């Protein structure tokens, strides 16, 4: 087990993912508690454990500081009543129906070794299913168009998208004379024609579902790409089609009732999503 874990080099999986790989590749079935103990004894901490340990140590340090302040002064200060920044905005409650809200984002990460690319991703807020993914060199209109096409093809028309305030969603008009660069007109027009509302937010907690998904993907996907010797965007986009099915089976399926509406036929979608050239 230790040799297997070491074989991943610097790109090591978290303990739960490692247990899945052990069962799949070596036919070794141990609980994550047992494997975690073996790794600890050998001096290994999983990436997830390191983050959890840092949070615990940070909380312990804060507690000690508060205790020291209490001993030094009986009068409360303003800092005693300040809320932690990450708690100032409560998390958004999960929606009830599939298609009611789709959260979208793009994650820049070295998915293939040292090469940084952007993974455009969309997750259904109610079910937790990934409904669209696409790799591109940058966060692009083209990337989100591919994600939208995947949603329309497999699921249908959702009620609303939730995104951050990126240029591709909120920029009303560019100074360029190229219609191609008027990104809001491009994506916003397509959504308007389909009857999809777009909401934007700069608050991470508001789109916590897709933020957490990005963290999970960054932990798992690079290892699976490496295992399958995938080193290019085109290879990765083909691989993602079957990878998503396995991911959703394991982590999604939290809602069954749907409000997705029937999407236009492929020919109509192609016309609607066609990018306007010069």
What are these regions (language model features)?
Residues 28, 40, 45-129, 140-159, ...:
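Mobile-element integrase/transposase regions
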Residues 163-165, 176-220, 236:
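RNase H-like two-metal-ion nuclease catalytic core shared by retroviral integrases
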Residues 31-34:
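Short coil turns linking two alpha-helices in DNA-binding domains
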Residues 78-83, 244-278:
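C-terminal, beta-rich DNA-binding module of retroviral/retroelements integrases
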Residues 14-28:
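DNA-recognition alpha helix
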Residues 1-10:
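Positively charged, polyanion-binding regions of nucleic-acid-associated proteins
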Residues 12-14, 105, 224-240:
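Short, charged, surface-exposed loops that flank catalytic or proteolytic processing sites
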């Amino acid at each position: 087990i230790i040799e297997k874990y070491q074989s991943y080099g610097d790109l090591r999986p978290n303990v739960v993912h490692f247990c899945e790989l052990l069962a799949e590749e070596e036919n070794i079935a141990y609980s994550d508690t047992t494997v975690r103990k073996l790794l600890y004894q050998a001096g290994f901490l999983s990436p997830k454990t390191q983050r959890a340990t840092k949070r615990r140590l940070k909380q312990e340090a804060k507690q000690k500081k508060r205790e020291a302040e209490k001993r030094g002064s009986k009068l409360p200060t303003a800092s005693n009543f300040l809320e932690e920044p990450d708690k100032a905005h409560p998390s958004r409650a999960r929606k009830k129906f599939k298609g009611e809200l789709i959260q979208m984002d793009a994650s820049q990460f070295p998915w293939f070794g040292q090469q940084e690319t952007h993974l455009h991703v969309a997750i259904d807020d109610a079910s937790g299913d990934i409904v669209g993914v696409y790799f591109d060199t940058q966060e692009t209109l083209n990337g989100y168009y591919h994600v939208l096409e995947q949603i329309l093809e497999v699921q249908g028309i959702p009620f609303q998208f939730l995104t951050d305030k990126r240029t591709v969603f909120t920029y009303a008009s560019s100074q360029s004379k190229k219609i191609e660069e008027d990104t809001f007109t491009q994506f916003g027009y397509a959504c308007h024609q389909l009857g999809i509302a777009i909401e934007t937010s700069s608050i991470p907690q508001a789109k916590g579902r897709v933020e957490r998904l990005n963290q999970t993907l960054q932990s798992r996907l690079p290892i699976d790409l490496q295992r399958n010797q995938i080193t290019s965007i085109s290879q990765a986009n083909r691989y993602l089609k079957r990878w998503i099915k396995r991911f959703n089976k394991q982590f999604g399926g939290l809602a069954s009732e749907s409000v997705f509406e029937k999407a236009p036929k492929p020919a109509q979608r192609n016309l609607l999503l066609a990018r306007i050239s010069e």
